[in-house]
Each structure stands twice: as structure tokens, then as C-alpha cells.
């Protein structure tokens, strides 16, 4: 295991950054249940978004998600200058179906505008290798921001939440005071949908244990652990290129140009929106819905029951900019 001492972490993140980071920041975000902000962002498969397009899309989706006048104003609602902000990206599927670097960097810039030291903004995934495969550059220290794999740096002792018992990455248990899930709009061969919530499987040491019964209630149980629940500020979904069949790995025949970026302070609503878009594309192709295909999306009901967000389609409010 790759372990960093507290002194090494302090040097990496800046003096005083680690004081009290095991607890969530005193700033509690303004949660908007059921609200998902969506902005247009179009690009071809394998092609980058223009920097300005990425900036406008991220700022627009973020502002719409909290009813702010601008992306900067929205970020200031969600993050405090004292935060250590961890952005968990899902790079399992490689470059063709991972969060686009330019969108992630647009979010980093918005967070930095709130006064968060760029050394205290870290983009992370399970390993350096996964980040590099998705097009990210490993950066042990910032600015412009840190980008590293957790690389098996887990707590020594497991903790429980509902039906799960896992060692969590120290990045979420000890280092970060605020978290963002940055996922992709795609289907999953077991849970039906893999968007923002299942991304947190990447911070536990034993995710392979929690795939029975469509990953239910395990996705919800990971997300309701205090390390996640008390620190999660935002879910962002890259839907520039999405996938409706063949996930969670990249499958060329299953991709489609959704051309959207979504943001929400409600992780359940974010995944509900992704589910809706996936089902819409499957219907256009004459494919059975996910339940008929043997992949019912069960975990959202469990997450809503746990108080994590809204799973009722009638209460989903999509604000498009």
C-alpha cells in the first residue's frame, strides 16, 4: 500500500490544510432536492470540448443546480476557502467514456474562484494508471490542482454502513472536507445505471463484494456512510457522450451523443436524470427498458429511503440553460 504520513499530506496540501479535515467543513451546502441543472456541451467521440465551451457548460449547469446567477456564485454557496475539495472521477472505461479533462478543469477553476487554495483541490481515482488512461496528468502537488490515484491507501480498520463493511480511502475519510462525484452517464450490467452514486465504489477496498441484487442496497449504503454523506457537496455528470448499453465498460455500439453536462446537490436526482436519459435512448433504438432487460435500477429507492435524495420522477426538476 502507498501510505502518506500526516506531515507529507500537510506539505502536499499546504500548511494547516489538514486541521480537522476528518470532519466535514462547518459550511453546509444549500441542498436543492430533486433539482438537476443541465447545460449543452457537444463534441464528437474522442474530441475535446473547447475550453470556453467547457467553462460555459460547467458554470451553467452548476448555477442552475442551486438557482445562482453564475457558476462562481454557485461554487461559493457550496465550498468554503478552508475546504480541502476532493473530486472523484470515474475513469473505469478509459478515455472514450470517462469525465473529460476539460470539464473537470472547468470545475476546478470554479472551486478555486471561491478562495480554495489550488493545492487543496485534488482530482482523484483509484489509481494513477486509470487517471492516465483517461487523459489526466498525474500531479503530486499543485497548482493548478492535484491529480492522483488513491493507490490502495485505505484506512487500516473497516467501518460499517448498512450492509457494507469496508476500509475507505483515506482521501475521503481523513483528507478531504468536501467531496464531488464526477461521473459519466452510462448503463451498468448489474445496477442498471452507473452515474454519480456508484462512483463511490471506487473509494472502498472491497467493491467486488457488493454487486449482488443489482448492487442494492449497497450503492446507497456506501453513499450514506458519514465519510460521503456528510461531505458530499455536488454530483456532476458528463453526458457529452453517453452510453445506453454495454456498460460499465466502453462499448462502441452503445454510445450516443447526449450533448449535456448535469450538476446537482441531490445525488439521487442526478442518477434519476441519467436513468431517464438512458431509457429514452434505449426506447429510440427499440431496445427493452433496463428492467425488462434484467437490470432493474433498484438502488435509487433505497437511497431515497435513506434520505439521500429524491427518486420520484414527478418531483424531478430539470433546469436547462
Language-model regions, residue ranges each:
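Sequence-pattern detector for short linear motifs
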Residues: 9-10, 91, 201
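N-terminal secretory signal peptides and thylakoid transit peptides that target proteins
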Residues: 1-17
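Flexible, active-site-proximal loop/turn residues at the rims of small-molecule/cofactor binding pockets
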Residues: 15, 91, 185
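Extended, low-polarity segments enriched in aliphatic/aromatic residues
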Residues: 27-81, 94-105, 109-321
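Boundary at the C-terminal end of the N-terminal hydrophobic targeting segment
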Residues: 22-24
Amino acid at each position: 500500500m502507498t501510505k502518506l504520513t500526516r506531515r507529507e499530506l500537510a506539505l502536499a496540501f499546504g500548511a494547516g490544510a489538514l486541521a480537522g479535515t476528518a470532519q466535514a467543513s462547518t459550511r453546509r451546502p444549500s441542498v436543492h432536492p430533486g433539482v438537476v441543472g443541465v447545460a449543452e456541451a457537444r463534441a464528437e467521440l474522442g474530441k475535446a470540448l473547447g475550453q470556453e465551451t467547457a467553462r460555459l457548460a460547467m458554470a451553467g449547469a452548476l448555477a442552475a443546480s442551486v438557482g445562482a446567477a453564475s457558476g462562481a456564485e454557485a461554487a461559493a454557496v457550496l465550498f468554503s476557502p478552508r475546504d480541502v475539495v476532493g473530486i472523484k472521477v470515474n475513469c473505469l472505461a478509459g478515455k472514450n467514456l470517462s469525465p473529460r479533462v476539460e470539464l473537470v478543469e472547468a470545475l476546478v477553476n470554479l472551486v478555486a474562484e471561491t478562495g480554495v487554495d489550488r493545492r487543496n483541490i485534488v482530482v482523484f481515482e483509484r489509481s494513477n494508471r486509470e487517471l492516465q488512461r483517461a487523459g489526466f496528468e498525474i500531479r503530486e502537488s499543485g497548482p493548478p490542482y492535484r491529480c492522483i490515484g488513491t493507490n490502495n491507501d485505505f484506512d487500516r480498520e473497516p467501518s460499517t454502513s448498512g450492509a457494507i463493511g469496508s476500509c475507505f480511502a483515506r482521501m475521503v475519510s481523513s483528507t478531504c472536507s468536501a467531496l464531488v462525484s464526477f461521473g459519466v452517464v452510462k448503463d451498468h450490467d448489474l445496477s442498471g445505471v452507473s452515474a454519480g452514486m456508484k462512483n463511490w465504489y471506487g473509494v472502498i477496498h472491497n467493491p467486488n463484494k457488493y454487486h449482488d441484487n443489482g448492487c442494492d442496497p449497497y450503492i446507497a449504503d456506501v453513499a450514506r456512510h458519514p465519510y460521503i454523506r456528510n461531505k458530499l457537496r455536488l454530483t456532476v455528470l458528463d453526458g457529452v457522450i453517453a452510453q445506453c448499453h454495454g456498460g460499465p465498460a466502453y462499448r462502441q455500439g452503445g454510445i450516443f451523443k447526449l450533448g449535456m453536462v448535469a450538476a446537482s446537490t441531490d445525488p439521487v436526482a442526478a442518477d434519476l436524470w441519467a436513468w431517464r436519459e438512458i431509457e429514452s435512448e434505449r426506447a429510440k433504438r427499440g431496445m427493452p427498458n433496463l428492467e425488462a432487460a434484467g437490470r432493474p435500477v433498484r438502488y435509487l429507492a433505497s437511497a431515497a429511503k435513506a434520505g439521500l435524495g429524491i427518486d420520484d420522477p414527478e418531483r424531478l426538476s430539470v433546469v436547462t440553460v
